[in-house]
């Protein structure tokens, strides 16, 4: 399988998101990179499922709570941005204050 650099980046981000999801499901509090990867993975999957940018921007703030992450992580993450592939092309999705 031949992947271009963008596809490799998306695959790596998705893989990191899957690891973070498994840890979250086991009750492990996520660190900074795991939190970013988890939110990004769900945004990319939502885009592939046909959700709109507006839907993902509002839903993205509900994926993680302060109880899901290590102490201080919620305050460190102000925005999460990911280029997601929608049925009509690639768009930038930005979620402000993603961890409440």
UniProtKB/Swiss-Prot annotation:
Disulfide bonds: none annotated. One of its GO terms (cellular component) is cytoplasm. Its main location: cytoplasm. Pathway: Nitrogen metabolism; urea degradation; CO(2) and NH(3) from urea (urease route): step 1/1. It is an enzyme of class 3 (hydrolase). Keywords: Cytoplasm, Hydrolase. GO terms for biological process: urea catabolic process. It is found in: Cytoplasm. Belongs to the urease gamma subunit family. Heterotrimer of UreA (gamma), UreB (beta) and UreC (alpha) subunits. Three heterotrimers associate to form the active enzyme. This is Urease subunit gamma 2. It comes from Psychrobacter cryohalolentis (strain ATCC BAA-1226 / DSM 17306 / VKM B-2378 / K5). The gene is ureA2.
């Amino acid at each position: 399988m031949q992947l271009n650099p963008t596809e490799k980046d998306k695959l790596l981000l998705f893989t990191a998101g899957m690891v973070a999801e498994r840890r979250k499901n086991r009750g492990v509090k996520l660190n900074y990179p795991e939190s970013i990867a988890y939110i990004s993975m769900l945004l990319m999957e939502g885009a592939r499922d046909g959700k709109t940018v507006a839907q993902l921007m509002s839903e993205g703030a509900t994926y993680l709570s302060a109880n899901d992450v290590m102490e201080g992580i919620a305050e460190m993450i102000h925005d999460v941005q990911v280029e997601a592939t929608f049925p009509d092309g690639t768009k930038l999705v930005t979620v402000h204050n993603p961890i409440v």
